Amino acid sequence: MAETNFNYSKLLRNLVTEDNVLNEVVVSFLYQLFPRDLFVRAFSLLESADMFIYVWMPTPKEADELLESLYNGTPLYRPIVRPRGPDDRPVCVDLDHWFCSCTEFAATCRPHLVGDTPLSDALFRPTEAADPDDCFGMLAGLQHLRADPEKLMCEHLFAFAILLQTDLRVLRHFSTGPGAQVFVLGITSIDEWLKLHLNVV
């Protein structure tokens, strides 16, 4: 199969079986598929209990409804990674615009900023469209993207994309039950939502 036709979402949604168990065969394959230990770092982040997804919901919802809305609805949400040290800052992720506030992601653009070529010319060119069913792989087919998608990826973007752009089953596996390691929190108060943006985002 040609790399341009590879459906990452279809593969990553098989990370968790129907019985809510990690599929070790898929985990091993993904380890080989992604470069420079990216999968290992993203998977470690998924198991770190440092990932939070804050969801704005003016009307309170049950926990399962809240998770389903992240796949079946269009809620306003903020994926955030808790700082690891006292001097660290929270990492904010925006999957819709493929942006992360971490230094690793910023470093991918830095060489283009110091060069003579404008950033838009350095990173963009016409490309073929991606498979419309492959939410996770859409980065590779963004109109005009020149840079290698793997270079515009960090562990935070990868981990949240695994949770939010593959299958609801994967999100449930990591965010529900006694062993939950990713926290999905609904916010119903506009004051609390604004405080989140002032204090974290």
UniProtKB/Swiss-Prot annotation:
Its main location: nucleus. GO terms for biological process: DNA recombination; DNA repair. Keywords: DNA damage, DNA recombination, DNA repair, Nucleus. The keyword Membrane does not apply. It comes from the Eukaryota. It is found in: Nucleus. GO terms for cellular component: nucleus. Plays a role in a RAD51/RAD54-dependent homologous recombination repair (HRR) pathway to repair MMS-induced lesions during S-phase. Required for error-free repair of spontaneous and induced DNA lesions to protect the genome from mutation. Belongs to the SHU2 family. This is Suppressor of hydroxyurea sensitivity protein 2. It comes from Eremothecium gossypii (strain ATCC 10895 / CBS 109.51 / FGSC 9923 / NRRL Y-1056).
